[in-house]
């Protein structure tokens, strides 16, 4: 395959990777990074990297979010590039240090490679600890947020099983919850 798309398992978002790849090819960039503009980077996304972008959406830096700015471009650890370039970057990172990440080597190459950013629109969450996991789940209780993530034309394939409906006892007090079937809810 001529191109590779790298995406993490701890970022929650929806994107058409075919369109992302097409945008990369049309731009002529060496590497295209996906980012999400946020206005709460002082409190959230503190374990994520942020991008420094120029006016043409060219990436000038990839640095840790130190929580010193409210508005940031959070790097979603998602990128596309040619397979040969990916392999050469990984080899170079390995030769430099066993602690080097792909983001580290890309940051080193910002001046020599054409690295561009593409903005992501819609629901986005970075799940790196229990508080961010909880916050993402609570955000998805909002119907608009859930619609941004789950699209009608993109079905979710899951394994179903037959179980009885959830049973709510008289003492149950349930608010802001998504409840699966097969449960018995009581309040003691």
What are these model-predicted stretches?
Residues 1:
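Short phosphate-binding loop-to-helix
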Residues 4:
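Short aromatic/hydrophobic "clamp" motif used to bind/position activated sugar donors
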Residues 7-8:
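Active-site acidic Asp-centered loop
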Residues 12-13, 125:
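Glycine-/small-residue-rich active-site loops that bind phosphorylated ligands and cofactors
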Residues 14-84:
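Conserved core of the sugar-phosphate nucleotidyltransferase
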Residues 62, 88-89, 136:
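Residues that scaffold the ATP/ADP-binding catalytic core of kinase and kinase-like folds
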Residues 84, 93-187:
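Left-handed beta-helix
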């Amino acid at each position: 395959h001529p191109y590779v798309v790298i995406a993490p398992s701890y970022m929650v978002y929806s994107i058409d990777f075919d369109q992302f790849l097409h945008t990369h090819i049309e731009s002529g960039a060496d590497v295209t990074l996906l980012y999400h503009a946020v206005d709460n980077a002082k409190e959230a996304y503190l374990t994520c990297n942020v991008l420094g972008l120029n006016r043409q959406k060219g990436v000038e830096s990839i640095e840790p979010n130190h929580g010193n700015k409210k508005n940031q471009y959070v790097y979603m650890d998602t990128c596309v590039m040619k397979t040969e370039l990916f392999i050469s970057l990984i080899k170079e990172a390995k030769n430099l240090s066993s602690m080097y990440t792909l983001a580290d080597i890309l940051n080193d190459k910002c001046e020599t490679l054409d690295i561009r950013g593409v903005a992501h629109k819609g629901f986005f969450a970075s799940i790196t600890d229990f508080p961010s996991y909880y916050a993402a789940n609570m955000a998805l209780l909002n119907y608009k947020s859930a619609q941004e993530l789950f699209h009608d034309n993109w079905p979710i394939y899951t394994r179903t099983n037959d179980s009885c409906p959830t049973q709510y006892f008289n003492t149950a007090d349930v608010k802001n919850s998504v409840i699966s079937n097969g449960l018995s809810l009581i309040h003691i």
